[in-house]
Structure formats: C-alpha cells, structure tokens
From Swiss-Prot:
This is Transcription repressor NadR. Keywords: DNA-binding, Repressor, Transcription, Transcription regulation. Disruption phenotype: No visible phenotype when grown in the absence of nicotinic acid. The gene is nadR. InterPro entries: 3H_dom_sf, 3H_domain, HTH_11, NadR, WH-like_DNA-bd_sf, WH_DNA-bd_sf.
Length: 180
C-alpha cells in the first residue's frame, strides 16, 4: 500500500459512506478495504466511528448496509416474535419467514450475564438465507440461540402486517413460533 493511494481519515470515512449509500447490496469489510487501499481492521474502526455519529449503518452477515430513511420507511410493518428450535432448523425457520415476503431484521437473546444481545441478520430472500447459513457453517460460528437452549426473538419487517401474519402462521404450523 503506497501512502498516496491510501484514503486518509475523514476523507476515507466520507468515501465509505458514499460507497455504502450508492451500493444496491451489502459491501464487506474486505471489499471496502480494497477500494480504500487500507486494512479491513481500519474499515471496522471507521464503521465504528461512523456509527458513533449516528450514521445508520448496520453490519449484516453479507456485509455493511446503509439504511437511509426511505429504506426504513419502505418496510412499514414491524413485529417482534419469539421462537424455539435447535440450530438444525435455522435455515427452515428463515426460509418460512422470507417466503412470505418478510425480512428478518435481527435475532435477540436474553443472556443471564450480559442481558439482551442483538445481532443484525437482514435476510429477506432465500439467497440471503443461504448465504447466511453458509457463512455460519464456514466459520463454525455458534447461533446466539444456542446460548439459550433455542429460545430467541426476531424482529420482522414487511410492507404490511398481513405478510407478517402469514409468516407467523407458517412458523406456528412448523412448531417454531412460541405463542403467548
């Protein structure tokens, strides 16, 4: 990496923000690092600094995404649901949800020491579900729900409540949804 080709400090963060805003799909830390001619760790630090300034960037399993107000308003209905299943049913669970036109925004567990732990998922298609599952498997990462014997919450978003109702019905029929 030559010094004159590197993007520096605030200029680099401005450029990262521009790339994320212009991108139609998530950008990985590695992709951003290559574009900026810096290490992935520098990108992680830059993203943290941008988030600290309340820039709406989320980290998903596919990479970083800029969530502008228009994108957030596009998904108008939102609901938190409780689920219970083992790790072997995660792909089935996510597919049942996205098949109804619903996006799984995140997963949340209640940890006995740390309290609520939330991780962004942001999957809305079978392709994104497949990518998420492959990434979990290739990194040997554990699902958060494994820390709570399969109990977890998901925040679901969709253009309307009916789609979320349909996804919940599919999860209930599969024995995954925890009802009140």
């Amino acid at each position: 990496m030559t010094e004159e080709l590197k993007l520096m400090g605030a200029n680099r963060r401005d450029q990262l923000l521009l790339w994320l805003k212009e991108s139609k799909s998530p950008l990985t830390g590695g992709e951003l690092a290559k574009k900026a001619n810096v290490s992935r760790q520098v990108i992680v630090q830059d993203i943290s600094l941008l988030k600290a300034k309340n820039v709406p960037i989320i980290a998903t399993s596919q990479g970083y995404v800029y969530m502008d107000a228009a994108a957030q308003q596009h998904q108008q209905a939102e609901r938190i649901i409780a689920c219970l299943h083992g790790p072997e049913r995660t792909e089935e669970e996510l597919q049942l949800i996205v098949d109804e036109g619903v996006t799984v925004k995140d997963v949340k567990i209640e940890h006995p020491v740390y309290g609520d732990l939330t991780a962004a998922i942001q999957v809305g298609t079978r392709k994104e579900v497949s990518h998420f599952i492959k990434k979990i498997n290739s990194t040997n990462a554990a699902y958060l729900s494994q820390l709570t014997d399969g109990v977890h919450l998901h925040t679901l978003t969709a253009p309307d409540e009916h789609r979320i109702d349909q996804a919940c019905q599919a999860l209930e029929e599969a024995g995954i949804l925890i009802k009140d």
